[in-house]
Amino acid sequence: MGASASRPVAPTASATANEKPSSATITNNTHHSADRLARIQAEANHRASRWSDAEGSKNKQRQNNVAPDVTLASLDEWNADAFSQLTHRLAATTLHNASINESLRVRDAELSNQHIFSHSVPTEAAHVTNQKSSGRCWLFATTNLIRLEVIKQLDIKDKDFELSQSYLHFYDKLEKSNFWLENVIELADRPWDDRELNYLSGSFFSDGGQWDEVTNLIVKYGVVPQSIYPESFNSSNTGKINWLMTVKLREMAQELRDLKSVTEERLQVSLDQGRISRADRDAAVLDTVRAHKQEQMKDVYRMLAIAYGRPPKPHEEFEFSWYDSKGKYQSLKTTPYDFQVKYTGTFTAKGSCSLVHDPRNESNKLITVSRLGNIWNAQPVLYVNTTPELMMDKVVESIKAGHAVFFGCDVGQFSYTASGVMDTKLYDYESAFGIKVRRREVRVEGLK
């Protein structure tokens, strides 16, 4: 779901009363991209521990005369062993002709997951939204929550009603561009191959995001019905515009780094002569660089507007019309900001927090990720680390209270779109490949 990440840090001390971390705050790589870095490091440590006695291993190898490379003799042995069992031959016959997931789907797992529930949210939208070829799942999930409240409050007859995902997407891209350039300014003294800066440069313009990122957008920009700012081709197919924007923003980043260096050099004489203090020099450099960044952001906005169309401004008035449940025409004039304040029912952008389960750390800790975000100086992305059991309890409580639930998971692993089933028992990888599906805490423990 998300954006960019590097080393984790605690939330900033400038957070509001509702945002301020407790003394239990820890730092952690919770975001999926940062988590990937942690796994790489853990695997490296694991390998290092196995290979620490390299010389001893070499001696043992010489004694046993075991070749370190793939030998042709080994190929003969492996080839004979590959299909030595009947199950291996059956798997090969089946899987080389069809999709692995289609072939290994377990019928009993599908049958045990019937879409009949003891509780459900009272208001449901008839139309299933479609993010198409984009990574905007987090925006769709959030607007799906809110649209149910709008349908209920405005008594909208059309159950296909949607809020504009592309409206939030436009401003997310605008903010992420600024967020990237501000990070570049802050890290301008580091080389491009610095691990943190290098990672940020490869992930800053992704479509993904987190709960706190979308609520930050909603608080600042509001929401609009999809009829006010509908989908464009590029909002539904983001690959090309993402590439173009990434190329342009990297060029802008280099401009800012060069400008900072030149400005510092120009003011160094005044600093050496004592005419200005170091603090004054640094402030002048920052003002100069940020002024240039503001000019760059004009180009960013222009490129986004060309690709997506110009969106309403947060306080720009629009008119929305609909039919109520009795078929009567209704209309109102409002702004995106006021729409999210007045017509979104019980939804409150900052009334919820993200619960996560990270088995590497103990429960009941507030965690964040360094440089993960979209709006500069907004509330940081925060998570409460807890147990799967508590997460499930809160989901049940929300549904019983009539509220749909925003959640994020790796849906590509054990889900089947046609039946809508998500189950770790859905695909029998173990019978075909000998791969066991283990809980994350077991996998993490195995890397220690």
Summary of predicted features, one role per range:
Residues 2-134, 139-448:
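Structured alpha-helical subdomains that flank or immediately precede key functional sites
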